[in-house]
From Swiss-Prot:
Gene3D superfamilies: Apolipoprotein, Serralysin-like metalloprotease, C-terminal. Residues 1671-1690 are annotated as: Disordered. The gene is frpC. Pfam families: HCBP_related, HemolysinCabind. Belongs to the RTX prokaryotic toxin (TC 1.C.11) family. May participate in the pathogenesis of meningococcal disease. InterPro entries: Haemolys_ca-bd, Hemolysin-typ_Ca-bd_CS, Hemolysn_Ca-bd, RTX_toxin/Mannuronan_C5-epim, RTX_toxin_determinant-A, Serralysin-like_metalloprot_C. SUPFAM superfamilies: beta-Roll. It is found in: Cell outer membrane; Secreted. Hemolysin-type calcium-binding repeats lie at residues 869-886, 887-904, 1015-1032, 1033-1050, 1051-1068, 1069-1086, 1087-1104, 1215-1232, 1233-1250, 1251-1268, 1269-1286, 1287-1304, 1415-1432, 1433-1450, 1451-1468, 1469-1486, 1487-1504, 1615-1632, 1633-1650, 1651-1668, 1669-1686, 1687-1704. It comes from Neisseria meningitidis serogroup B (strain ATCC BAA-335 / MC58). This is Iron-regulated protein FrpC.
Length: 1829
């Protein structure tokens, strides 16, 4: 925030918004003025509330009120003034809110006021508009701001934002600054202020005398003075004001200074201009001086004459007004005519002289903007050598911060300061080069420093007597050297040495007192001037007190007051003196001495000095190593070469640091020690933490990283002016972070140095090719030589040309060099085609590529076009300032021209592009230009919202001009002209006409503010009205029509249309179709027309019109306004007796009796017809009118049909009559009789009586104590709130009492009724009352679930009380008492006893929570336990018994019973029969008893008990809990040897050997018996116990029968023994022996061995590398997956290897075997013949099989061998040879010739004439290959 800047708080903003919303313009401005806004102070005066209005404010107010030239009459002008003022104030408040409380700047205020003026219909020649846009062109923001009283500070603040580097290139802001400071010595006083007063006088005449004086001489006089004012005073004043200011602007010496500044900067930057160019510069500057002098002379003369003429005119007008007041009409007329002539002559005289000056200025300065732009562009080709320091500061800041944090001290400076103005010692922050620089440490380098403010001073002593304070040694602080050679601890210690008499005071008694000075640095530059050094006597200082206190007070700005004392003045008063710790910024530094450079040295590349380093040129002049390295770097021709030298260059510059090599090596430490002269040390907590971590050691990796960074740390110290002797860390992570910050900072530094030297080194030869040329009488830069230079380099080194051009465009600010961008595009395309693009991009680096992928303009006139970088063809172009040309190219592009006259170019294939053209400036001319043969007839022009859409008719592209039609195309977003390739031009007016033309499709048509007729035509169209009175015709199609602010007519026509009226008194006609009409504001007329329409009138007095065939229409008439009168009007002869009036809910339904239509008036009856939705009157074609009261009576009349009748709030009797009726009560006490039919009756809030009558009725009591009588039929009664009486009557009724104490009444023949009595309230008493002689002994009481069933013993009826027993009868559903006709009463406790009594039938008995014994007796009973410990006896029958939460005992007794234990430790005994027992949770005991039982223990440690005759039982023992122990217990003398234990799958089978029973433990062996289904122990009656391990052993023992034996996961050996056995392997390596019998053996996942033994066996290998041996018999072997070995053994075997590399082994006597070797893998299979030589085996083809025959008895058939490789065996191995598949393949592939011949492999030739392979020739016996029989 700038000092003194006003910023509103959120609360103040809210208060301001309140003024805006109330329209209190004056109050709002005054509120802002009181907060310090000086613009608001003047604005408050201008809006006319302040009494003392004078001067400039009067001029502004009267000008705004009276100078409109398009309005007549004072009242109209004042109203318009008020509207302008209010809109401007509201926009001003909105800007403050958007700016987070900051006041708007001048540009924002200008735009706000301009918009307020134009939005309220004021033409561009209005007074304020003149001030902004005519009188002061190009300077409107500055002069206008001053004119309206904006303080100079805010103008300056805006300059600082717009020119952060202090650039003076914007001439408008130069003139503002010059004006504010008093341009031309006393410009404001001499010219501007004076001219304001003259203008005020003229205005005053036009106002006061027009109103007062001229009225006395009649209407003709008033007309003449108006004509005089408009034709002479106003127009001519405007002209001279414009000329004067234009000449002032063009004659401003700043133009000349700017030229000289540019030339100086260019030369200073090291650019060598030739003699010709220097001559041109000199000629131009000389011409400028000559013409400038002429301009000044002529302009001054013009100003003087103009001012004189205006003053004379003003005096004459005053005199004329006086004469006219009392003179005759004839005399008055003559005076006015003379006055007009005199004014004209005076003006012409002044104008002639002024125009001569203007013409001279225009002639010279016509070319100056382009020439100035030329110089700026050339200078912008290279960075400013000084400018890199700001970048360097940013990149080095992290290192400075890190060293401050790690080295235990902060660099501060420590001088004594005095408070000279009594407000405390004040300091300022470091400000880089813009602030104070001082040599504190006496090393010859001035560095940026915190400083004492100008109103306080530093205590100093000029030790060397040169009149200047040279360095910190001449201050009093820690750089003061004491007599003993040490440095002072602080300022007070330094001053104490001057206390020669030891009295602890420095005064005249001390010898050095007279040598002391106070330095008051008035200009804050850190350099002492003579007028800034004052003696103590001059300042009235008598003595300096050496006593002080340590305060360590934070002064802000990075500065601290460390010690504070005082000094005494000669008047006896005291003031503060303190020792400061000033912030240090060593980056911004300047050496006090300059190095004189030779001409050659001055040509070297340069960067400004930084830290402890001189300017690069100066440093190189002092260092031969650096000079040589800089020369080598400058001569390097490629980026790679420069980067290879960059590190060395950076180091060589760093080595010129005066401290280089003089300080001790940097070390890292966790042990901090306080030392003197260390500045501000670590905090105590940081010290404590360091001491805690003193033992932290670093890993070798961390140490290596730190060692590698040491050199870079030294470099960074030189560049930053830091000293990193010791860096502290608290952990290894801290240490590694130091390395990271070091490397990151160094890399950023290297990047900045590279970029800032680029144009002074490698790219300089290209810049030398840029020349100048004259075009249209002005200088421009000529880049043609530059293009040639790049192409020349490209011929020999394409990569260099590519990289150099890319970096020139990226860093040279040459985006306006169109040829260069086009050249880059060509280079990119060529690189892509050559496959080099990615390589080139890697050389460039990500940052450069990103800059080229982004396209953004400058303040100049740029040509912007994507050059092919980036991954997306869709680009965004930003023109910013200047007259820019934006070319998007292919892809979907975003183009934003910014300010200036911009041109958007679109050629063939332009894509889906968007143009954002916001530019509020006047005089700009923005153009869209279509090229490549595109003409207007190839495009369509449509509008969508405020956007203009230009679409190619062939669908190839679209340009969207955003907000084009804002302000009807006159706003800031417009495109002024659209140009086509055939020369045709469309202006805004033509475009506006085009977009209002309809098509046969779906159009969007918009009216303009003046009012239009729009016709949608065919298609589903959108029509939008504006502020005029529009006629909007939708025509055919489903149209959407939106009115504007006028009185519009909307006609939907055919189709289902939507019409919206908005403001104004609109007429809406839906036409045909189902339409939606909404009148919104105004007194509207809505005609739905044919179809089913929805009509909303909105606010205002609306009329809904319905004629014949109006359809099924709906009216929504919400309008809460008072005084409105809404009407429904029936036309076309429709009368009231042709309609019916009924009510449905709050809706009124008006139906045609002939069924032709209906009007539903929604919510008509809200508030009994007095609400916001009512229709006030219904009018008919015969003149009859129905008001609301009449309608209310009509809708309560019943018919013989199904009626809906509603009571009103006062209470009514409604009779439904015949039909199924709906009756609704209200707030009164209503009597609602349903009568005949199935009626629905709803009570209201009163005590109502509801009588259903005949039929199945529904009665709802709602609030109140209601009486509900269902009558005949099956009725539903709901009492809801209140103490209600419910009588179901005849039929099967459902009764709900609701809340309150309710009574249910049942008499004879009450039917099958249900009571739902939910009511949780305390204190209620609900009763069932039996009448008509019914007593308790005539009824039975039973329970079903939680329901109570009360049944008539004669079967005539039943009452079910739902959920009665919830919470054991104490819940919300209970009936508190049951009353009988004999006076007997049953309470809840009695009822609970009754329902637990059993019968001989099938009972449902329920225990209560306290615990019960229930006996089912005879019948199939259901017994239910509860939370107590229950005894539940099923007794006889098939019973279902359910335990509760207690420890319950369940006895099934006789029959097939189901027992469920639920929670608790339960005992379940099934008894006789086939029972199902489920213990569920708890440690349960389950006894199945006799019969075949199914037992589930559930969770917990359960025991299953089996005695004699236990039957065929099954145990399901799933329980995954840890710690449980489940047991099977055999009783009745049963021991283990009486049983067998076998396994079937995962089940354990325990069988009685005598066949009397079996227990199947399901899934016992899951996870090898460790799973959730296991039984932990089996107990026998003799005490023996079997654990799981024992059982597992038992089931693996074989018998002489057919066994099923299973291996375990760890690996097992299984022996089948006798019998046909099934053996199953598992995941381990198993040995499975089938032994005798026809066995089936299944391997598992391990490497298993399967031996079939005797018999015809089946062996299956599964996964793993298995060995299968069939043994004797005809066996089937299948290896499946893995590398298996298959041995068929004796017999005729079938062998399948499966996948993997399998081996088939055949020995002597192997029989007639078949091998099926199909596989899809690439493994190798082998057939091994043991005991056979190759000559013993014949190879025979048999169809597709290969037969290997050793004898008639022994042969192997390889099935499908000749089908292909997937069926073959790869290698045949014999005792003496091996034949591989490749050896054999050529003979297989030889085909029939080989098959039909005999080849002797041992001979040298064969029938085919070919030779055989050597390994096959080694076979001595012929191998026959013959066709099969």
């Amino acid at each position: 925030m700038n000092e003194g800047e006003v910023v509103l708080t959120p609360e103040q903003i809210q208060t301001l918004r309140g003024y805006a919303s109330r329209g209190d313009t004056y109050g709002g401005w005054r509120y802002l003025a009181n907060l310090g806004d000086r613009y608001a102070d003047d604005a408050a005066a201008i809006v006319g509330k302040d009494a003392n209005l004078n001067g400039l404010n009067l001029w502004m107010k009267k000008g705004v009120e009276n100078l409109w030239d398009d309005t007549v009459g004072k009242k109209t002008r004042l109203e318009k003034f008020d509207r302008v003022a209010l809109q401007h104030f509201r926009q001003y408040a909105r800007l403050i809110n958007q700016n987070n409380g900051r006041l708007p700047n001048t540009s924002e205020i200008e735009r706000s006021y301009y918009k307020a003026v134009t939005d309220n219909g004021v033409s561009s020649s209005a007074a304020i508009d003149l001030v902004i846009n005519r009188s002061l062109p190009d300077m409107a923001d500055g002069y206008w701001a001053l004119g309206l009283g904006i303080e100079a500070e805010r103008i300056h603040n805006e300059q600082a934002v717009n020119n952060p580097n202090g650039s003076e290139r914007d001439n408008r802001k130069q003139l503002i600054s010059a004006l504010d400071k008093g341009f031309d010595g006393s410009f404001k006083e001499k010219h501007f202020t004076f001219l304001q007063s003259v203008m005020m006088d003229v205005t005053k005449l036009g106002v006061e005398y027009t109103i007062d004086g001229w009225q006395k001489i009649g209407g003709w006089g008033n007309g003449i003075i108006n004509d005089l004012y408009k034709s002479v005073v106003k127009r001519e004043w405007t002209g001279i004001f414009e000329i004067v200011n234009n000449n002032i602007k063009q004659g401003n010496e700043a133009f000349k200074n700017e030229i000289n500044s540019l030339v100086h900067d260019m030369k200073a930057a090291g650019k060598e201009f030739g003699d010709d160019l220097n001559t041109q510069w000199n000629n131009l500057t000389q011409a400028a001086e000559i013409i400038y002098n002429d301009i000044v002379d002529n302009t001054s003369q013009g100003i003087e004459k103009g001012v004189k003429a205006i003053k004379e005119l003003s005096e004459k007008m005053k005199n004329a007004a006086s004469d006219l007041a009392d003179g005759s009409a004839e005399k008055a007329k003559q005076v006015v005519e003379d006055l007009a002539q005199a004014a004209k002559e005076a003006y012409e005289n002044a104008k002639s002289t002024a125009e001569k000056a203007a013409q001279a200025a225009r002639e010279f300065f016509k070319g100056l903007p382009s020439f100035k732009d030329l110089a700026e562009k050339f200078r912008d080709l290279f960075p400013n050598p000084e400018g890199w320091i700001d970048d360097g500061h940013q990149c080095l800041a992290p290192w400075v911060k890190e060293t401050k944090k790690r080295n235990g001290k902060y660099h501060v400076y420590d001088p004594l300061a005095l408070d000279l103005d009594g407000d405390g010692i004040e300091t300022v922050a470091t400000k880089g080069f813009a602030g104070s620089l001082f040599d504190h440490t006496n090393n010859g380098i001035r560095t940026a420093t915190g400083w004492v403010s100008a109103d306080d001073g530093l205590l100093v002593r000029d030790l060397n007597g040169n009149g200047i304070i040279d360095n910190g040694a001449e201050l009093f602080g820690d750089n003061t050297k004491l007599a003993d050679g040490s440095f002072a601890k602080h300022g007070y210690a330094a001053l104490a040495e001057l206390d020669s008499n030891g009295d602890n005071i420095i005064n005249a008694a001390d010898a050095a007192f007279q040598t002391l000075r106070v330095w008051q640095d008035l200009n804050q530059d850190g350099i002492s001037q003579a007028n800034e050094l004052r003696t103590l006597e001059e300042l009235g200082i008598q003595s300096l007190d050496l006593a002080y206190k340590d305060v360590n007070k934070n002064l802000g700005n990075g500065n601290t007051l460390a010690q504070q004392g005082s000094y005494t003045k000669t008047d006896g008063t005291t003031a503060k003196m303190g020792d400061l710790l000033l912030a240090a910024d060593n980056l911004h530094s300047r050496f006090k001495d300059k190095v004189e450079l030779t001409a050659e040295q001055a040509k070297a590349a340069n960067l400004a000095g930084i830290g402890r380093l001189r300017d690069l040129r100066e440093a190189a002049a002092l260092s031969g190593d650096l000079a040589n390295m800089l020369k080598a770097y400058s001569a390097a021709e490629t980026k790679e070469a420069q980067l290879a030298l960059l590190d060395n260059l950076i180091h060589k510059w760093a080595e010129t640091d005066s401290n280089w090599g003089k300080k001790s090596p940097m070390r890292l430490s966790t042990d901090w020690t306080q030392t003197a002269n260390e500045g501000i040390a670590l905090t105590p907590s940081q010290v404590a933490q360091l001491k805690k971590n003193a033992l932290v050691s670093l890993s070798d990796k961390a140490k290596a990283a730190i060692d590698a960074a040491r050199d870079r740390i030294a470099v960074l110290d030189a560049y930053t002016g830091q000293d990193s002797n010791t860096l502290y860390y608290m952990s290894e992570e801290d240490a590694l972070n130091i390395v990271k910050v070091t490397n990151d900072t160094y890399d950023h530094l290297a990047k900045n140095i590279y970029q800032n030297l680029l144009f002074q080194t490698r790219l300089q030869p290209y810049l030398n090719q840029i020349s100048f040329k004259m075009e249209n009488d002005t200088f421009t830069l000529d880049f043609s030589g530059l293009v040639q230079a790049f192409n020349h380099v490209k011929e020999t080194n394409p990569q260099k040309a590519f990289v150099d051009l890319a970096e020139m465009l990226a860093y040279g600010e040459l985006r306006s060099w169109y040829e260069g961008r086009r050249l880059m595009t060509d280079y990119v395309e060529e690189a892509k085609k050559a496959g080099k693009f990615e390589d080139y991009q890697k050389v460039l680096g990500q940052e450069t590529v990103a800059l080229l992928a982004k396209t953004s303009g400058t303040q100049a006139d740029d040509i912007l076009q994507n050059v092919g970088f980036g991954h997306n063809k869709n680009v965004s172009l930003y023109g910013n300032d200047g007259n820019d040309t934006l070319i998007g190219g292919a892809g979907n592009d975003y183009l934003e021209g910014g300010s200036g006259s911009d041109t958007y170019v679109f050629g063939e294939g332009f894509g889906q592009d968007t143009v954002y053209n916001y530019d509020y400036a006047t005089g700009r001319k923005d153009i869209i230009r279509f090229t490549d043969g595109i003409t207007a007839d190839m495009l369509t022009f449509t509008r969508e919202g405020n956007h203009l859409l230009i679409k190619a008719k062939d669908g190839s592209g679209q340009v969207t001009v955003q907000s084009y039609f804002q302000n009807d195309g006159s706003g800031a977003y417009r495109i002024d002209e659209i140009h086509f390739d055939n020369g045709k031009v469309l202006d805004v007016a033509t475009v506006k006409e085009l977009v209002q033309q309809s098509t046969d499709g779906s159009d969007r048509l918009y009216a303009y503010q003046s009012g239009n007729t729009l016709n949608g035509g065919l298609g589903d169209d959108y029509l939008y009205g504006a502020d005029g009175d529009d006629l909007l015709n939708g025509d055919a199609g489903n149209d959407s029509i939106y009115s504007g602010n006028g009185n519009d007519t909307l006609d939907g026509g055919e189709g289902n249309d939507a019409l919206y009226g908005y403001n104004g008194n609109d007429a809406l006609n839906g036409g045909e179709g189902n339409d939606h009409l909404n009148g919104e504001d105004g007194n509207d007329t809505l005609i739905g027309g044919a179809g089913n329409d929805y009509l909303e009138g909105g606010s205002g007095s609306d009329t809904y019109v319905f004629g014949k065939g109006f359809g099924q229409d709906t009216v929504y008439n919400y309008d809460y306004a008072t005084g409105r009168k809404d009407i429904i009007r029936f036309t076309d002869g429709i009368t009231a007796d042709m309609l019916t009036f009924t009510r449905e809910g709050n809706h009124l339904l008006i139906k045609a009796k002939d069924g032709s239509g209906q009007v539903t008036v929604q919510y008509y009856f809200q508030n009994d017809g007095s609400g916001a939705y009512r229709i006030d009157e219904i009018h008919f074609d015969n003149g009859k009118v129905l008001d609301v009261a009449t309608v209310k009576e009509l809708v309560q009349q019943s018919t013989d049909g199904s009626d809906r009748l509603y009571a009103y709030q006062s209470g009514n009797t409604l009779n439904g009559g015949l039909g199924d009726d709906y009756l609704y009560g209200a707030d009164g006490d209503d009597l609602l009789n349903g009568d005949a039919g199935n009626d629905s009756i709803y009570s209201g809030n009163g005590n109502d009586t509801l009588d259903g009558g005949e039929g199945n009725d529904a009665l709802y009591g709602y609030n109140g104590n209601d009486a509900l009588n269902g009558g005949e039929g099956n009725d539903h009664l709901n009492g809801e709130d209140g103490n209600d009486t419910l009588i179901g009557g005849a039929g099967n009724d459902y009764l709900e009492g609701g809340s309150g104490s309710d009574t249910y009444v049942f008499g004879k023949g009450f039917g099958q009724d249900a009571v739902y009595n939910y009511d949780y309230a305390t204190g209620r008493k609900d009763i069932i009352r039996f009448t008509d002689g019914i007593t308790a002994d005539m009824l039975t009481f039973t329970r079903e679930g939680n329901h109570l069933l009360i049944k008539a013993k004669d079967g005539s009826g039943q009452v079910t009380v739902q959920s009665y027993f919830q919470n054991d009868g104490s819940g919300a559903y209970r009936i508190d008492e049951i009353h009988f006709d004999n006076g007997k009463v049953l309470d809840v406790a009695t009822v609970k006893e009754l329902v637990q009594q059993s019968t001989d039938g099938s009972d449902r008995l329920y225990a209560y929570q306290s615990g019960n014994t229930l006996n089912g007796g005879l019948g199939d009973d259901y017994l239910y336990g509860a939370d107590g410990d229950d005894l539940l006896n099923g007794d006889a029958g098939n019973d279902s018994i359910y335990s509760g939460n207690g420890n319950d005992t369940l006895n099934g007794g006789e029959g097939n019973d189901a027992l469920y234990g639920y929670n608790g430790n339960d005992a379940l005994n099934g008894g006789e029969g086939n029972d199902h027992l489920n213990g569920e949770d708890g440690n349960d005991t389950l006894i199945g008893g006799a019969g075949n039982d199914y037992l589930e223990g559930g969770s917990g440690s359960d025991t299953y008990v089996f005695g004699k005759g236990f039957g065929q039982d099954a145990v399901y023992n799933y329980d995954y809990a840890t710690g449980r122990k489940d047991i099977i217990r055999f009783t009745d003398g049963i021991t283990a040897d009486m049983l067998t234990f076998t396994r079937e799958g995962n089940h354990l089978l325990i069988k009685a050997k005598d066949g009397s029973g079996q227990v199947t433990v399901q899934s016992y062996f899951q996870n090898d018996g460790s799973g959730a289904y296991r039984i932990d122990e089996i107990h026998f009656d003799n005490g023996k116990v079997l654990d799981v391990a024992t059982v597992k052993e038992l089931v693996q023992q074989s018998t002489d029968g057919s066994d099923r034996l299973y291996a375990y996961q760890s690996g097992s050996t299984l022996n089948g023994g006798l019998g046909d056995d099934y053996l199953y392997g598992a995941d381990g390596d198993d040995l499975l022996n089938g032994d005798a019998g026809n066995d089936s053996i299944y391997s598992g996942n391990g490497n298993d061995t399967l031996d079939g033994g005797e018999g015809n066996d089946a062996l299956y290998g599964y996964n793993g590398n298995d060995a299968l041996n069939g043994g004797e018999g005809n066996d089937h072997l299948n290896g499946e997956d893995g590398n298996d070995t298959l041995i068929g053994g004796a017999g005729n075997d079938y062998l399948e290897g499966g996948s993997g590399s399998d081996t088939y082994v055949f020995g002597e006597g192997f029989g007639q075997d078949t091998v099926y070797n199909y596989h899809v893998d690439k493994n190798s299979d082998t057939m091994h013949f043991k005991g056979f030589k190759a000559a013993d085996v014949h190879f025979i083809r048999s169809g597709s099989d290969l037969v290997l025959s050793a004898s008639e008895q022994d042969n192997v058939r390889i099935s499908g061998f000749f089908y292909g490789e997937n069926h073959r065996v790869d290698t045949f191995v014999f005792d003496d040879a091996a034949i591989s598949n490749p050896d054999f393949a050529k003979y297989i592939n030889a085909g029939n010739n080989l098959v039909q011949s005999m080849s002797v492999f041992g001979s040298n030739t064969a029938a085919t004439g070919g030779n055989v392979d050597a390994n096959i020739q080694s076979v001595q016996q012929p191998l026959l290959v013959t066709p099969s029989a």
